[in-house]
Amino acid sequence: MSIWRPPLHNVPGLEHLWYESVHRSHAAVCGCGDPVRHLTALAERYGIPGGSRSSGAPGVGGNHNPPQIRRARHPAAAPDPPAGNQPPALPWHGDGGNESGAGGGESGGPVADFADDGLDDLVAALDEEELLKTPAPSPPLKYPVAVTSLAEYKSSIRKSSDPATVSDPLTSDVTCLAARVLKESQNNKRLLSFYSPAANAPGSTFPSTSRQKKTSISKRDNKENRDRGRAKARAKQKPKKRRRRARSESSSSSSSKSSFNSEEGSSASSSS
């Protein structure tokens, strides 16, 4: 369903365009030059779509046979614009088809002004301009060269396989190794420079080297303090054991002395 409706403020212009379209469609099919008579005869033969023909409609003089369709040679000229101060209608471009094809419809405006040879030249010029705009590869591409003999093949292989500098067998080139080492060292340096500010930031979660050092030092100090405390405790406990032993020895000596004294007293009493 189309929502568009033709404007009503330019009815003569619309009528002119409609008449032009009918003229062109007839010229594309038939070359009799009388589209009005041809269309009227067809309407009398097939009837008016949507209803019967009214009684007052003009006829073609009783001839119900339409004219024979002729070969379209050249399109008819454009009808004259209506008289009066009417807005100009769209211009008719081109001269229609050719002698071998069906005429009437225009060839598409500016395209009809070029011949076949002109189009080919134009396309070739555009292609050449596009090739000139394409940047050349740098360095230029090296295409393979055909080998004509075995000696030429061997010489080309030897030239391509010779190293730039002298190196030991089963090892790569010295310059290549040096370049790799330099590249790896540069990458390591970049990584260190990238992670060092992030690790030293106050709110960062990365482990810092200074923090690790502090924790290791604190652990070592705690261990040393524990060892010292244990040594002091052991030193304090040893004299106590010695005192206990001395007390036991003194008690044993006193008990032996008392037993000896008791024995002497008993012997003296027995002798008396």
UniProtKB/Swiss-Prot annotation:
Gly residues bias spans: 94-108
Annotated region (Disordered), positions in chain: 50-116, 195-272
Domain of life from the UniProt record: Viruses
Post-translational note: Phosphorylated at C-terminal serines.
Biased composition (Low complexity): 249-272
Pro residues bias (residue ranges): 78-90
Composition bias, Basic and acidic residues: 218-230
Keyword Phosphoprotein attached: yes
InterPro entries: DUF755 (IPR008474), HEV_TT_vir_Orf2/Gyrovir_Vp2_N (IPR004118)
Entry keywords, A to Z: Phosphoprotein
Compositional bias of kind Basic residues: 231-246
Record-given protein name: Probable protein VP2
